[in-house]
Structure formats: structure tokens, C-alpha cells
């Protein structure tokens, strides 16, 4: 269990940093698989009485859905805001698919069968969505993908190597790619 493996070392490091920087807030972040880990970690911190530090917020980048509707409904959003960044060509934030995505894609040739497998999983998005558009601008509280946007993304994925390369570049967090272009336009990159 990844959370169990990380629990003690991360809490220990948080405590060390809190000792070095008293009064400073704690933020949890994660990219890709690290997004749900940060989110689940924050929930566990909140619901563990022995843990006296609560994150100020969770920021995720390219995060898959962290849990099902029950997890989302019971997450302490009032205490720990979750801000999730999603890049327009990144498919990772769409998995596991939500019920809306399954309904949207379930009757489509090729991908429909794949989506039907996930029926009943009941995964859901969590937190405030910040969408990075084609011009690398961050759009706040953009609704989930429309059917037209979903079709366009699906065609990009199945277009072959060029489309897959675009999708892979959109998922990256390195300088000059995907998430860095939208979240850090003035640059920390050389």
C-alpha cells in the first residue's frame, strides 16, 4: 500500500519542517499518480486524531480521480481545499472515468467497451478545476469536458504517433511543456 509506505516518512518530514519554520502552512502537491496520493494523504491527516497538522490546501497536477463519490462526498473540503490543474490534451485526469464520461463514451466504437468496464466504479472529480487551455492560460472553474471536447481529445489520442506525442507532452510537468507553460508562464526555468 503506497499510502502506508509514505505515511510515517512524510509525516516525519512535515514535523521537521514545522520545527524549522514554525507557523508556516503546509501544502500537499502531487503530479499524475502523486495527485491522488496527496489528496488521500490530506484526508488521512484530517481524520487521524494524533496528527495535529492539517494541510492548508492540496494542489494536484494531471491527477487521476482520487476516489469514488463516497470519498469525494466525505472529503473535508471545508477544511482542506483541493485545487486540481488539468491540461487540455492530458488524458490522465479523465481516469478512472466518471459516470458522466462512461455515459458519454460508452456507446462509441472502439473506446465504448473500455469505458463500459468501469461502470459502477463511481469515480468522481474532487475540488476546484483549473483548466490550462491551448494558449496555456489558466481558466478557473471550467466545467468538465463537453462531448465536443471529449471527441477532439479522443481523435488526438487515436491519430497516431503525432497525436500521442501531443498528449504525452501535455502531461509533462517539465520546463517548456504541459503544466509548466500554464502554471508558471514567467518562468522558474532557465
Sequence positions of predicted segments:
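Serine hydrolase/lipase
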Residues: 2-29, 43-190
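Gly/Ala-rich beta-loop-alpha elbow adjacent to hydrolase catalytic centers
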Residues: 30-34, 38
